[in-house]
């Protein structure tokens, strides 16, 4: 009986440790996805070097004067963020709360 109790306590401790590690990994994953989202927003919003186009939208304005607002983009332009189904689901949850 004592041996089973000891084994139970060891397994219980391993489970606690595994759950803690899982939580840490999920937090890191969320942070990485948020960083991707932020960098993607920064890139799609544009700066002086991207006024003629981006990899995502193309470079139609390269040979022209880019007088139009090139800083406008839609969520469908987010090819990296949208590639993560979990991140999309989380973002939809955030929008529902607002």
UniProtKB/Swiss-Prot annotation:
Domain of life: Eukaryota
Name of one Pfam family that matches: NuA4
Keyword Acyltransferase carried by entry: no
GO biological process annotation, one example: DNA repair
InterPro entries in the record: Eaf6 (IPR015418)
Keyword terms, alphabetized: Chromatin regulator, Coiled coil, DNA damage, DNA repair, Nucleus, Transcription, Transcription regulation
Similarity section: Belongs to the EAF6 family.
PANTHER family: CHROMATIN MODIFICATION-RELATED PROTEIN MEAF6 (PTHR13476)
Self-association and partners: Component of the NuA4 histone acetyltransferase complex.
Protein name (Swiss-Prot/TrEMBL): Chromatin modification-related protein EAF6
Species, as recorded: Eremothecium gossypii (strain ATCC 10895 / CBS 109.51 / FGSC 9923 / NRRL Y-1056)
Species lineage: Eukaryota, Fungi, Dikarya, Ascomycota, Saccharomycotina
């Amino acid at each position: 009986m004592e041996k089973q109790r000891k084994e139970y306590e060891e397994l219980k401790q391993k489970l606690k440790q595994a759950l803690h590690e899982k939580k840490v990994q999920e937090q890191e994953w969320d942070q990485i996805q948020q960083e991707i989202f932020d960098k993607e927003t920064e890139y799609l919003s544009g700066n002086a070097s991207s006024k003629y186009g981006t990899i995502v939208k193309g470079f139609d304005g390269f040979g022209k004067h880019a007088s139009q607002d090139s800083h406008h983009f839609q969520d469908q332009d987010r090819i990296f963020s949208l590639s993560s189904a979990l991140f999309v689901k989380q973002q939809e949850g955030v929008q529902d709360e607002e």
